[in-house]
């Protein structure tokens, strides 16, 4: 569902794009099974996303955001350019748009309101920008930017993550290696601690060349 969201939003942010087609929104049961649909094989909701949630990013009117990245340090500023794709029956007059940043517990860190906006029919309609210093986020946090048009069901949101720029680390008395070698054995035998980090750092045995046969 998240992949569909980003693909569809990318399309809606593209100027002069003629449209898009989604193929196979349900699970495919033939010639083996492909459990990859937003809906199950009976075209019923899977339980992890609802039709109401899908219409936030796939519908006649969709608020959009251009966000350079989704992971930040708290010495940075979150920036987003807000626009909208609107293909309803008429332009939206005197629209009141709210921008909110909150955490997963509902605490609001940022809120801004734009009043009396006229939203014409079309794509890439610019609404404004969001700039928020992340200095007040002192511990790792999952935040959410939501853009809503008051008095309508038109809304969309995006998650992003913030981490401290400086982290105090305590190495402790730990022997770190990528190979279970003699020193690791000696450290364990003497009651010490060993951390083996083998992921993509294996040095022992790299001299063996593998070939296809």
Residue spans of the language-model regions?
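Beta-strand-rich interaction surfaces with strong enrichment in secreted/lumenal proteins
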Residues: 68-70, 114-120, 133-134
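Short, exposed coil/turn segments at beta-strand boundaries within extracellular/luminal domains
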Residues: 151-157
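Low-complexity, Pro/Ser/Thr- and charge-rich linker/hinge segments at domain boundaries
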Residues: 160-179
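Beta-strand-rich binding/interaction modules
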Residues: 75-117, 127-131, 140-150
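A glycine-rich, often tryptophan-bearing local segment used as a flexible ligand/cofactor-contacting loop or short
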Residues: 180-213
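Flexible loop/turn segments at secondary-structure boundaries
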Residues: 27-34, 108, 183, 202-204
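Substrate-binding clefts and catalytic carboxylate motifs of secreted carbohydrate-active enzymes
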Residues: 1-94, 100
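Structural recognition of the beta-strand scaffold that forms the well-ordered cores
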Residues: 19-24, 176, 194-197
């Amino acid at each position: 569902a998240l992949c569909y969201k980003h693909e569809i939003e990318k399309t809606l942010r593209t100027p002069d794009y003629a449209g898009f087609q989604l193929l196979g929104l349900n699970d495919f049961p033939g010639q083996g099974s492909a459990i990859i649909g937003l809906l199950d094989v009976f075209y019923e909701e899977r339980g992890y996303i609802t039709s109401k949630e899908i219409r936030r990013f796939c519908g006649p009117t969709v608020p959009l955001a251009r966000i350079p990245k989704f992971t930040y340090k708290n010495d940075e500023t979150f920036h987003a350019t807000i626009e909208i794709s609107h293909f309803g029956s008429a332009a939206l007059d005197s629209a009141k748009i709210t921008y909110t940043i909150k955490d997963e517990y509902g605490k609001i860190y940022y809120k801004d309101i734009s009043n009396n906006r006229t939203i014409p029919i079309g794509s890439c309609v610019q609404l404004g920008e969001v700039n928020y210093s992340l200095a007040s986020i002192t511990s790792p946090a999952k935040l959410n930017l939501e853009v809503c048009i008051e008095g309508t069901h038109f809304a969309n949101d995006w998650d992003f993550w913030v981490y401290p720029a400086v982290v105090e680390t305590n190495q402790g008395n730990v022997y770190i290696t990528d190979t279970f070698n003699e020193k690791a054995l000696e450290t364990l035998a003497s009651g010490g601690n060993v951390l083996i980090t083998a992921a993509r750092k294996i040095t022992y045995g790299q001299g063996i060349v593998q070939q296809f046969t």
